[in-house]
């Protein structure tokens, strides 16, 4: 079932009025990989009428008013990625293309889309509450360093003048908000909901206070301190309120929602998604973003890898939940009935596929402890369950109509090597790899890897050797390729040349999978970039801020110039 995008579609459903209207910076793709589709179907499954306005023209009222006034609230998201990341390259150049837009052309979403859409709604529907959500809002919920303007900005809740902000995976919080507003009509009563950020005129009586907006604007060290506190205390099982003064008000973060149970996750992903671009937007052109996920399966939600540059820790916390085998097999059966299904499940996974079935008795009862699960090495308390993941893949392959099953999402090779006999899983993984297994060592220099909170590169080499040796014995031409980041805090020319030499010596090919580090809001790496400090050790960190030098670092590793760069 497609959710309505026009009045005509509402009439066909017999809906005279909508309870909730969701506004997004992406095209409307009715697939569980897209946030508005998940939230929209979840609300509908609980009896609410929901419509979607995708990529509205922000220069006119035509699009934002086409579904009328919602009974309860507008929900606003910039889309699956931060709008500034969507609109600009790592060299701050305007992108000409957008994979989330029909036809692939850029310019269909505004910069700082969450703020722009909220202001547009407030202009034409000033009395209707606006609730923010999605990655952009979640990662900008407190005062944050904004690389594009090169300054610290206030909470996006304050800047946008929205009523509430939902952070993390928002199904439960948005449902509670809808239920409270349906009963009372009072947005103030929604400020007790877990997973919500709100503002207060008075300082909260309890909780953890972060350094204020003024403090972190004037002192980058305070920014590092704020990020550390936010990281440690944002945990559903610690149940701690966090707040930050901004001007004369306080931005208040309630404790996160508890992760969805397996039963809740199962029900969510089996809602009646069309797994297609909505016809209203499909007629405008192809949406490239659906092509890689259309016949994929989300088996895992969350990641406890805690990589410094990754937004997941701040967005979803470190808690991992996973679906039951029965639920996943039922979704595969649904996919096999699609007219354009060719027999291949392109991916079974999530942020990190081989965390499926893993558990930690401490994290799942008391919250994240004062150490990282996989750094500097795999914690002994974390229990992998690769057998269960392999059993799942084997069961999928036996379903009529399925010819191939692939694992294309992240694999933590250090987690595999922590097993007593890693080859048991690696041998099976060879069967489910589509030619090349993509791993993310990210760098080679020990200092940079330590700041990234990534395992030693020697583990990548060990895994690569095991995988390719087993593949050869099995008569399979399958290989491991690496993804790398340059320009990350801690990298100068010495470290960059070290990475170049490593690739030349150990990989034997010129890699194309090289990214320039982008300081996106809310991550540990961005705190390092702005403050010049490791937030968790207080040690000084070298930061390369010159766009010209950062681009040269990429060229150096891509072997576009002969010889090594001088340091």
Curated annotation (Swiss-Prot):
Binds 1 [4Fe-4S] cluster. The cluster is coordinated with 3 cysteines and an exchangeable S-adenosyl-L-methionine. Residues 288-560 form the Radical SAM core domain. Keywords: 4Fe-4S, Iron, Iron-sulfur, Metal-binding, S-adenosyl-L-methionine. GO terms for molecular function: 4 iron, 4 sulfur cluster binding; catalytic activity; iron ion binding. Its cofactor is [4Fe-4S] cluster. The keyword Hydrolase does not apply. InterPro entries: Elp3/MiaA/NifB-like_rSAM, rSAM, rSAM_horseshoe, UPF0313, UPF0313_C, UPF0313_N. [4Fe-4S] cluster binds at residues 303, 307, 310. PROSITE patterns: RADICAL_SAM (PS51918). Pfam families: DUF3362, Radical_SAM, Radical_SAM_N. NCBIfam families: SAM_YgiQ. Belongs to the UPF0313 family. This is UPF0313 protein CTN_0332.
